Amino acid sequence: MIQNPLAQPSRRRQRQNILLAFLLSLGAVAAAYALLGFAPFGDGTMLTGDLNGLYVAYITDLWRRVRQGGLGYSFAKLCGGSTLGLFAYYMDSPFNLLYLIFPVRAIPYVAQGVFALRTALTGAAACFYFGRHFRSDSRLLPVLSLGYSLCAFCVVYSQNIIWMDVVLLAPLLLSAVDALQDTGRHWPLTALVLLAALFNFYTAWEVCLFSVLYYLYRWFSAPRRGFWRLFGRFAASGCLGAGLAAFLLIPSLLEVEESKGGLFAIDFSLAPTFNLAQLPYRLFFGNFFWDDVTGSLPNLYCGVFAAALAVLFFAGAFPRREKIAAALLLAAMALSCWVQGLNLIWHGFKEPVWFPCRFSFLLSLFLRTLAGRALLAGRPGRRALLI
């Protein structure tokens, strides 16, 4: 929520904060590369899992087809077929244009550069959202943003590059929801839903679902008149954005349904997916195990101090309605991770194979938002935020 409705933050300082968030995330990735001996600081690369076994092959195929022709059709697909679904689901990212600039043998190293650039832009987007959401130009915001750009989801699931563009857009989309409620402007929301749907419709579905919960959270925290009128504008903006992307969405969905099979098969069950007592552990420990990919627990870690601040938010002197709204949203997200049927809805009504709770980055973003609310009210030391 807005930290101080009378505050008038400096736009110049806000822009500086966005740049600082970009540089801070970029520097953190560069430091990790240096410590791990990744190029250009060593001979290692970050190619692992699906990035190495799947996406490098797709990017190489795209690189060759751009130069040799045949973008819409390939004989390498079974006995030949359309590549529209493959492009829309796996390759529809503006960052992939960077691969086309360099020789094909440089793809492993370009992938590392793309990860660093995308992470830096994700931090900048989060800082933009925090600055607008809190109406603040505090120098703590770039550090707060780092916890989102390098949260457990962004690091562990970074090998699935198809999801990361929408992870970048998520803070901007929430900022657009704020703008709709505060000023009535709807075009930013329409534009961002369009971009998210074009970049990856699978993750866009998750962000759009969360935006509904976030809209209700904002409204319940500070109710005002005209709920149905404004909610109608919110729904219309989202539908318009998705509709503008229909030229790519509809044929792509049909092709993915044909190739993957059972895209819309529903097996709604209320069975738990994991022991609920394990969930708090994921907030305070960020160590990686292979079960993080193959198991069922969500990747929620976004900083120990951020999780502690989110807890302090509920003990702080904030409006009761705001705390109730935040608790309801957190409960809805926790149940979505825990209950199989709800989990299935978030994953497009198809059970995921590995990489569980692919929407958990949204929970990390909201936890950082609550942490920022408590942080800007109490202003603990900057060093504590990095814990």
Stretch-by-stretch model annotation:
Residues C302-M333:
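Hydrophobic, aromatic-rich transmembrane alpha-helices
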Residues A28-G123, L146-V167, E206, V256-G261, ...:
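Membrane-interface coil-to-helix junctions
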Residues M1-F38, R233:
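Start-transfer (signal-anchor) and selected internal transmembrane alpha helices
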Residues G113-T122, M164-L172, C208, Y301-A307, ...:
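Membrane-embedded alpha-helical segments of multi-pass membrane proteins
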Residues T119-R132, R139-Q181, R185-F220, R233-L253, ...:
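Membrane-embedded helix bundles of polyisoprenyl
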